[in-house]
């Protein structure tokens, strides 16, 4: 059966329905109903964490997948910066586990490789000039008050870890150093002498899901 990623527990949405069963949802689970809301459940109104992409940028993204564009759309850049800010906050709070961002903008593997090249070049170039830091600052200042603990408690009052959420956003200057560290090493995942992956804490690992070869590239 296909993966029921961000799927709902309705019989009609499960395939094959006579082969698998849906487990009860945990009160710590963020599924599509919580994120996007449900027209059938007034208790779930959705979370203000989804940003729409302008039609013009969708066209640029399509060109990028086809190898016809050499820059990232603005909203794409903003999403990368917001991830860097979020990762920097966690790192500043002594978070030790890996932090990842899944970028999935096309079903075509070739498009992901085109996107990878443009993204890597953009990160390296902007890190060298320092201009990405200003974009991170701008995105941080515009987004940090768009979704608050109050918003979360109203949209998902049954969330099991609501009392553990740290609602304080540090000033950008407090996380800038962590962002600089992340941008200081942009590379693939290297392999050690024993052929096992070697991960670094002071940088960003970029990889493409090379499912045809059953490996990461």
Model-found features: residue ranges?
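Conserved P-loop NTPase catalytic core
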Residues: 1-90, 134-146
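Conserved C-terminal RecA-like helicase domain
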Residues: 89, 93-216
